Structure formats: structure tokens, C-alpha cells
Amino acid sequence: MTRETTAAAAESTIRSLEDQRYAAVIAGDVDGFLALAHPDLVYTHSNAEVDTLDSYVDKLRSGHYVYHHIDHPVSRVLIAGHTAVVVGEMHADLTAGGVRKKLANRALAVWVRDRDRWLLLAYQPTVIPGDDR
């Protein structure tokens, strides 16, 4: 395989994993999300709150976060060695702490290759200002 072929295959895999992780949280499939997440996950929210894997999963299990719908267009996937950076957006309809919300964020997700599989290591959304939505 050429370097370009390998990078294209990795990009395709990462795009699929992004679809799977969003589908898991929409479905309330915590085990499905856990299968995709690195144990050292840093999950930052658009309100600047930061969760670890354990605290985020606890919030999913308790119903603190209930995702009703998510669109997540991907602009770019950058592959550098065993790291993939996903640049895109996340538009969501969710309930957080009992309050229904709509989110419009630019988003950055970091995946790392660990023992022949890709795992989500970090997620960072940034609110898109109202005029730019």
C-alpha cells in the first residue's frame, strides 16, 4: 500500500467511527460509546465543562445528557502517524440536566491508534456565533 492509500483508508475509518460514536450517544448505547473511547478521554463541552471518560459515561447513563438528534458534518480529517484530527461541526438537539437545548458548534475530535484500533482521545466544541450558523 502506498502512503496515500493508507491515509485514505485511515480517513475512511475515522469518518465511520465518528458516525458510530454519534449514533451510540443518540441511541443511548453507552457500551457502544465506551468501545470507541480511550480510557484517558478528555471530553470538553461548549460551556467549558470538562468530563473524563468516567464522568461523561456516568452522565449518559443517568440521563443527564439525552441526545435527540445530531448532525456532524466533517470538513477535514488529518492523519499524522497514530493520530487523527477531525475538523467539523456538531449541531445537536439534546436535553442536558433536564433542559432542552440546541447546539451549533465547530468541533475538533482527536483519535489515536492504540493496539490496532482507533480510539477517541479528546473532543472540543466551540460555539458558532449566531451570525455564522
Show the residue positions of the predicted features:
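A beta-strand edge to alpha-helix "cap/lid" segment located at domain peripheries
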Residues: M1-A35, D40-R133
